[in-house]
């Protein structure tokens, strides 16, 4: 078998990883030491290569290595450079592509290994999955200092078989000698934790946030061996934040090892000082917030009923200032425009925080990593992300807290233009609305602007630097004047007070913001797979009705421009290409025939769920159960990918038939 240089390198790396896992070097050293001691003690001190090989053969080391490295035909024929298709329902048994990593010899690295789990008691009775059988899986997502990793999915079990390692670069960006290798003292001053998110994926493709944990890694600085092992207990989220989910076996190791370690007392003292400083800053901010709130109520007693939200609970039920949930976030080359950012946020799934028992809405503002890894969240999560992205694009953006129709609590995003233009952004669908206030004192003959937005009341607005409470006589959005510099209309909080607890690095309890990740979804492959599944479902549906199904591939292909046009319109607000689509359909449908089409949009890739939703539409059902002469059916699926593997899925069902009436 001849291999290209690239594939040969990949193969060498796989063999190297296998040898490392088997600890072959350690075995060779042990054999060498034993051979030198026992067999060559009285002979000459020269040990030849043949002597060593004979000793290795006698002890079975070489045979073990050969057996471990024996590749079957499937492994030989596999293309090592292709990226395996990520599993959605089934366990991914394929060997992952080994990515080449440029390791800077002048940098320090933290090797974090997750070596299994235990006491995941919710899955105590979980049966062992059969090969190829669909089962629920666990995945661990990790973030540390702008570096993100994701573990291989493993079957849910009482003792899940996590076997993953992550190489984390440890350095200080803001130091003048940032190119130098970080020593123990420098690393001790790096207070960023390693955030671990545990996600469960069930057999229907639904994701659940199981646990969110912040790992303090600096205990490795006091280890004489440069390694330390930890039993990390994961707690639940929301109402279950005090309940243990399970325990992860974690091993930390520094590369290269420290030449000088720190004493346990120094590390303990540093962590204690950081906690004390954080607690003091948070205490002072709470004292200030209480005083500010008393002043706000003195303006007008009715302010007590307004939605002025200063603090919000995260997934671990920790109270944080709302300003800490927003920060300018640049998407690199993943998103090009603010409107594209709004479209991306809108295709992330919407799901309210689960409530145990009855009662009102469960409050849970997720940290950004938890929201992105789960790929869905409540409207507050969407708004915080959208506001952060708009700030990253240089806009003056704020999150608005208020209500929409029927008094339902809601949040949305507002941008304030340099010319005073106020634009509302709905994070759940990407819609934009211009705000023009109504003047209640205007004469009856004066035409007032019509409000197209669904928002009714507004209590406060905030971003990473500002918090402003609405103190106008009415908190109605349509009457609101957004002159943010007028303190008679908007009562501000001290920017210094906000900065003391919300700016990056101000407190050790503040979760760092992760970068966005590019999509790993192959749009063409996913589109084709969904289309084939829908064809099968339609054929079976018509078969149950006693109808035959004839597909026309050309008609299906002609539906593509329409789906592309719909997505462009959602992103830019501009409708383009409709004339060409209509002209092509007219040419494809003969005289005397009728054409019907039904487009629909989803943010998931579950064919059965999508098909069940489509059948609830009478118009779609009319197409799928169409009876007539010379019936030809068509279906087209177009998957549009966005960062974080979010997808906008457009489906169009169509039919053409000869009219007999």
Q: Where are the predicted features?
A:
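His-Asp-centered catalytic microenvironments across diverse enzyme cores
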Residues: 229-238, 246-255, 264-298, 373-374, ...
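Acidic, S/T/P/G-rich intrinsically disordered/coiled linkers that flank
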Residues: 1-139, 143, 147-149, 190-192, ...
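C2-type phospholipid-binding modules
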Residues: 124, 189-263
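Intrinsically disordered, low-complexity regions enriched in proline, serine, glycine
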Residues: 121-126, 150-154, 177-180, 205-209, ...
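Short proline/glycine- and polar residue-rich coil/turn motifs
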Residues: 155-162
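Eukaryotic intrinsically disordered and solvent-exposed regulatory patches
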Residues: 95-100, 123-128, 150-155, 167-171, ...
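Secondary-structure boundary elements
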Residues: 286-378
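Eukaryotic beta-sheet cores, primarily in C2 and C2-like/PH beta-sandwich modules
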Residues: 112, 137-142, 163-217
